Amino acid sequence: MLRKTFKHFISISAIFVLIFSIYTYAGEYRGEVISATGEVYIIDSAGEHHAVEGPGYPVRETDTLVTDQGGTAIISFNDGVLSVLNENSRLRVEKTYWLSHLGGKIYFTFRKVFNGTRHVKTRFATLGIRGTTFIIYDNNDQQAVALQEGLLDIESHGPAFEIHRRHQLDEFEAFKQQQMQQQQKEELRKEFDEYRQQLQREFIEFKRNFSMQAEHVISFDGDRVDERVIDDDAMADFENFEAIAGDLLEEFREQARPHRENIESQPVLDEEDFE
């Protein structure tokens, strides 16, 4: 009798352990694939590959989304993110408010939220995000971020970045106009060379974290960061991603609009409001 009861207890315990293991293995639901073309699959926490053959495929914590040559995928996350993976790209899903870019070219657009900053971790930096649209590049050709709108906080994984900020050519034009009437051309060029060297010294910074403004591109080469105004190539990439997303992106933006307007209508509190 005792032996039979013990066996019954062991069987029930095993069932509970199995159920718990399945629940843990599945991970928390984070969103779903809303469009997929070509070779797209998900690698789960156990390393199993699951082909994504159409919309509605659930995405959970610890899943890694992968697109092969010619594949694209659009994922809608439940914390207010829409992401578009280009071919040969990998995106790991972490806990809420966290994603990890593992490689390739991926487009992100984030809704504004009340409760804290979202993050995307890359191999070269961690990006802190609030209501932003940007592309991350990480392939054999480059490691870079192109920011269309919003603001990004860039944080190093290790030592301080050596940040080089390119100055606009209109600085030279303004300088030239001011000096043209007083200096000969050769003297003007000499003065401007000295002025440009001074600007270059002033716009090299060493920081572990810094802010990136909209309509700029930053490129990474080890600890060196080069910032420049967004160029035609980056703008073409945004247009290509928006064409891939099509109506799905428009629906996402429409859903985000009331939330954004609600945030923007909130009063800005001064320090004395907390005293």
What are these regions (language model features)?
Residues 39-41, 91, 107-108, 135:
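Active-site/binding-pocket entry motifs
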Residues 128-134:
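Active-site glycine-rich loop that binds ribose-phosphate moieties when present
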Residues 2-14, 23-29, 47-55, 60, ...:
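C-terminal interaction modules
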Residues 38-40, 70-72, 132:
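Generic short beta-strand segments
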Residues 59, 65-127, 145-154:
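Short, small-residue-rich packing micro-motifs
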